[in-house]
Amino acid sequence: MQKIKSAALALPALLLAGCAAALPAENTATIETAAAAAPQTLKVYTSASLAPAAQAYAEAQGVALTLTDEAASADLLLTDHAPGGSLLDVTSDTLLAAAAARAGITENANALPLGRSLYGYWARADVLNALLGDGAAAALQTANWEEWSDFVETLSAWMAEPKAATVTLSGTDYTLPDARPGSLTATGVFAAPLDRASGYTAALLAADGTYTADALTGPLNGVYSAVTLEWDHMAADGGEGIFRRAKLTDLLAEYGADTCNGLVLVPFKCQLDDSDLTAEDYNAEGLLNYPVLADVGSIAINAGTSADGLKAAKSAALWLYSNGAGEDALTETLGVVTPWNTAAGTTAVTAMQVQQVGTGILPGVALDTAAADALAANELTLQDSEKHTKAERTAFVDGALAALGAE
C-alpha cells in the first residue's frame, strides 16, 4: 500500500487514506443452485437501504414478500451491520457453504456479506459548481481540515446572508457568489446523515485496529471535531442540506438512480494529525483525503425458522449470490461492489465508484449492529450542544470507546 505523505444534496442532503489498485480479479467460482422451485412466501427483516434486494428477488421469482419490524420473527435478515440473535451457521449447509466460499468465508459464520459501497459526504455537482465554479468537488476532496472547516463555516454564514466571500481549498482560492444560485434549495450546509457508523473507519484505521483507549482516544477526538462541525451547520427540522453523509447504497434506496447520477463524493473529514496514529500503513493526510469503501451489510437466516421459512430464506440468499439477475440486484439495484469483486458501471454514479476504487480507497471496518447503534446514539447526544467544552469532548470520546468495546 502506497502511503500518502501529509500534512442533501439539496435533497435532504449527503475519501479517507489507504490506496487500492483496480478492482481485484473476480472470483469466478460458481455455486450449484438449488433445483427446487422458489418458495411462495418469504418473511424478511431488512434495513431501508437493503430492502430493494429483497424486493427484486420477490418480483423475479414470484414470491410473496412480507416485511417485518421484528428480527426474531423473520426467515431472512438483511441488515446494515452484523446482526445478533440465534442465526444459522451458513457453512453448515452445502449450498450456503459454497456461497460463503465465494465471499472468501471458509470457517463458521452466521452471515453472508452483501458487498461494499462508497461512503462520505455526497453533494450535487451542479450546486457545487454554481457556488464555487468548475473543479470545486476535486478541490474539496483534497482540502485539509483547516480549509474544510473554514469553508463550512463561511458557507453557513453565506447561506444566511449571501455576499461574495473567498475560501481556500487545496491551496487555491474560490469565491462564493454575491447572490444565491437558483439551483440551491438547501437550508443548511448538512442534512442528517443516513449512516453514522461508517464515519469511524478513519479512526479505527488510524488505531491500526487496536481497540484500546490509548490507541483510539486521539482519532476519536478527530471524529468529535467532525461531528460537532456537522451539527453546528445542519439544516433545521430535517431540512435539505448541500452535503449528506451516507453510503451510495443508502442514497440509491432513498432517491433512485436518476437523482444519484448527478452526485459527487467528498470525504467525511476528521481532524487528525500524525501524532494521533499508531498505524504504519496510513498517515493523516491519506485518512483525510481518500474515500471509504464501507461494508453495506449482510444476509442472515434465523436458526429457529420453520422448514418452509428456511427453504425460502436459502433460496433468496442463493439467488443473490449465484443467479445473474441476483448479482444485478446487488451491483445495479443496490450499487455495491460484491464480495467477489464485481461491480456495475452502467450509470454515472456507479461508474464513478468503480473508477474511485481503482484510484484509491480506505477499506471499510465491520461493526456489529449493537456497536453501530451505540455510536449513532452517542453522536445524537451532541445535537443540541451550543458550547463545545472539554468535558463534552471527553464524554463523547468515552461514549465512543464504550460503544466500540475498547479496553
Where are these regions (language model features)?
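Pocket-flanking alpha-helical
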Residues: 55, 69-111, 153-166, 250-257
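Helix-loop-helix "hinge/cap" segment bordering the ligand-binding cleft or interdomain interface
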Residues: 67-70, 105-197, 208-235, 305
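Periplasmic-binding protein-like
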Residues: 160, 164, 317-344, 348
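Extracytoplasmic/periplasmic substrate-binding proteins
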Residues: 200-307
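Short amphipathic alpha-helical coupling segments at ligand-binding clamshell hinges
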Residues: 307-320
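Conserved C-terminal helix/tail region of periplasmic/extracytoplasmic solute-binding proteins
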Residues: 338-407
